[in-house]
């Protein structure tokens, strides 16, 4: 497992550096702007693209065929993808949280004010990946582009339709903060279910 994770980071190191540069620019915009919340959410979702890119790299390099003759189980291969995604998202969230706390101290606000945003961003991004990763394991990165776009757009379409229908959702910061514990448990359950589904899909796949 450790070797698989190391391979993910070494293979994607140039892309990770590129993403880090882009995120640093956005964090600077957030620091000199008025709100960091939007930047934190964007940075976490932006990092989900890393695992999608890793699938594309694996397909083009022939890694998927090679790794299946190594002394690792298919379950470990699946878990390494999930862990890679979670580590990247957690890293982006932690860095954003650090900047948020520093800004709060500078502005005389409570240190952990709006700290919940980073956690909420990780949970939402994890739910997104819980849907995306089984699709990627099933059909691969190249064939799933349209599906990924649709999955990404569905929440926005639902929100737009709800607004047009006059449905008002109580999504105040206080309400969202109170939902964090339940949302966290639900997210863990969904991620574990997604991982099990991906293992089933990948276990039956032929190379």
Language-model region placement:
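Hydrophobic alpha-helical transmembrane segments of membrane proteins
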Residues: 1-62, 80-207
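Alpha-helix N-cap/helix-start motif at helix boundaries, enriched for small hydrophobics
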Residues: 76-78
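Short helix-to-coil transition segments within interhelical loops
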Residues: 69-74
């Amino acid at each position: 497992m450790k070797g698989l994770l190391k391979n993910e980071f070494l293979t994607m190191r140039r892309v990770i550096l590129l993403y880090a540069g882009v995120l640093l620019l956005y964090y600077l915009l957030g620091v000199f702007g008025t709100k960091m919340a939007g930047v934190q959410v964007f940075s976490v979702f932006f990092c989900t693209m890393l695992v999608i890119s890793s699938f594309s790299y694996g397909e083009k390099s022939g890694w998927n065929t090679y790794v299946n003759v190594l002394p690792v189980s298919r379950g470990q291969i699946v878990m390494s993808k999930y862990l890679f995604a979670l580590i990247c998202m957690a890293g982006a969230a932690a860095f954003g949280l650090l900047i948020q706390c520093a800004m709060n101290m500078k502005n005389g606000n409570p240190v952990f004010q709006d700290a919940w945003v980073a956690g909420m961003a990780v949970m939402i991004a994890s739910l997104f990946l819980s849907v995306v990763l089984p699709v990627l394991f099933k059909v691969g990165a190249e064939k799933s582009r349209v599906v990924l776009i649709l999955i990404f757009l569905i929440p926005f379409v639902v929100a737009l339709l709800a607004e047009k229908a006059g449905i008002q959702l109580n999504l105040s910061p206080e309400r969202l903060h109170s939902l964090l514990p339940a949302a966290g448990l639900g997210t863990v359950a969904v991620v574990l279910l997604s991982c099990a589904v991906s293992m089933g899909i990948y276990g039956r796949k032929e190379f």
